[in-house]
Amino acid sequence: MELKTMPQNGANAGTQHNNNSNNKPDNNEKEAQKKEPERTNWSNGLEFLMSCISVSVGLGNVWRFPFTAYENGGGAFLIPYIIVLFLIGKPMYYLEMIIGQFTSQGTVKIWSICPSFMGVGYGQAFATICIITYYSSLLALTVYYLFVSFQSELPWSYCRDDWVNCVNSRPAEYVETLLTNASSALSRATESATNVTKLQSSSELYFLNVVIKEKSDITDGIGAPDWKLTIALFVSWVVIFLVIMRGVKSSGKAAYFLALFPYVVLFALLGRAVTLEGAVDGIIFFLQPQWGELLNPIVWKEAVVQCFFSLAVGCGPIIMFASYNRFDHGIYRDAMIVTTLDTLTSLLGGITIFAILGNLAHNLKVDNIRDVVRSGTGLAFISYPDAISKFQAVPQLFSALFFFMLFVLGIGSIVALQSTIVTIICDQFKTCKYWKVAMATSICGFLMGLVYVTPGGQWILTLVDFYGGTYVVFILAIFELAGIVWIYGLQNFCDDIEFMSNKKVSLYWRICWSFFTPIMMIVIFIYSMVTISPIKYSDTYFPVAGDVAGWVLFAVGAAQFPLWGWWYIRTHRHDSFSKSFMASLKPSEKWGPSNPETRRDWLLFKSDLAAKRAIQAKSNKMGFFRQKLYNLCGNSN
């Protein structure tokens, strides 16, 4: 029997007034679907899992999580982080996997579920581009440090003649030089305190003066790109292109190495780190909770930001990866594996890094480990190299391993983000060759990344990360969840999951998606915006023009949502604006599984549910709120 009309997505008209859908497949649509080329699938499910691990278990775990934790309560930060993981991270991650696999579409095309929300996809693409550009600059730094790690002596371990108040980072010499300089400084009565505080390690001065040639301010411009970092940036983009040039056929094979190799290095570093003197103190410092921080709303905000950053939620790569799955792939298992492994890796990375920093503090005779830690980029390229240079045995080997690990982690993250952009373009323009789009976007990524390898590049990185990445992703993730769960409807969405997985959706997911996840995200976002303060880099506030540029960047990303919604309503007019607006909130005729046969089965499945619920509604005669509770518990079938 051919289904001529689509019931209102199995929703009772009296109780699902917000969730109606009038999908009416016709012969023209079916013919169009048959003519479209089939989407490439992963060679096997393990490639998908490894790809998700490579993007979710990345720089966010080894580079960002440790200093975020110690800045927000140490071990106490793990409590809000784990709570946020279960109430926001896991639900959002699973939701994005589902929507990608169900539709076999990228970040923009999935919004046939609610066409006026297509701006969410474009806004996420904008944020993804911002993140890609500065991520690639971090890769350039890792390539540079990896290359110089093979010198007979690590170049950041000793001072240059023109570096004033510098202390060598060599093992024993560091402490000796520090004590000598401090003693000399203290002998100068009026200048003692000033000179002591000016002492800097050779690793810090090497990074600031030799590698990035940092400017103290950017009021007079950011300067020209450094030629060495430009070459390193170019090498990074060549590797990225080679990995993604054939789509999932090439990136899927590379995912095994990108996902597993970092663990080999991480465990090797952990094995070495825990044997160092002072390592236990560093680990205790990392895990020791500061309970008072649990009542600080900023800590909870940082937990959400870290969760999004680490899992790559809200940027599109999870949706993109899942869109290449078979329709019946078991993604629930994969979602649980990746989100759990991500948390464990963050803990592993934190313990490893703080064991090394504990040894650094021990060598420097410093009681407070906080005094030897720098946040942001400085953690990876100042604190870690400083600690590694003090290793007694072959520091070059551990340095090369560490920076190669960072490079692999960065490649895994950027490959996913870049593939998201390429997929969006190829989904929109079906005739485009994937490798040509990959090459064009890689060239654009390289050119945009040049701004970050200038003397003022770290200033720009801080600005773009704060305004173009963090907050844009945050607000669009709220709209993403609202569009799927509140507009399309929780029950409709759960019906689709049941059809795809042949299993009912548990109460945990229903409650999180409909209540806990969106409410927590909205409250934290509002608090963040109300309490936001001007950003600064290296204890220096940005000039007014910098803050203005940042807000413009945020506005451009966030404005994608209303602008594309307005465009859709204007180009799909009905009798009145109100009718056009309401129609834009309903799924289009393109919504649903992309495979024609699967789509036909889905329509029949939804039709049967609608008939059953109509009978139940007449016999039960439930009140509105009772029916809502009944649906929430998943007993409406």
UniProtKB/Swiss-Prot annotation:
Gene that this sequence comes from: NAAT1
UniProt keyword annotations, A-Z: Amino-acid transport, Glycoprotein, Ion transport, Membrane, Sodium, Sodium transport, Symport, Transmembrane, Transmembrane helix, Transport
Listed Pfam families: SNF
Similarity section: Belongs to the sodium:neurotransmitter symporter (SNF) (TC 2.A.22) family.
Main localization, broad class: membrane
Organism listed in the record: Drosophila virilis (Fruit fly)
Protein's GO biological process: amino acid import across plasma membrane; D-amino acid transport; neutral amino acid transport; sodium ion transport
InterPro entries linked: Na/ntran_symport (IPR000175), SNS_sf (IPR037272)
Cellular component per GO, a single term: plasma membrane
Membrane topology according to the record: Multi-pass membrane protein
A GO molecular function held by the record: D-amino acid transmembrane transporter activity
Name of protein: Sodium-dependent nutrient amino acid transporter 1
The organism's taxonomic lineage, starting at the top: Eukaryota, Metazoa, Ecdysozoa, Arthropoda, Hexapoda
Parts of the chain on the Cytoplasmic side: 1-47
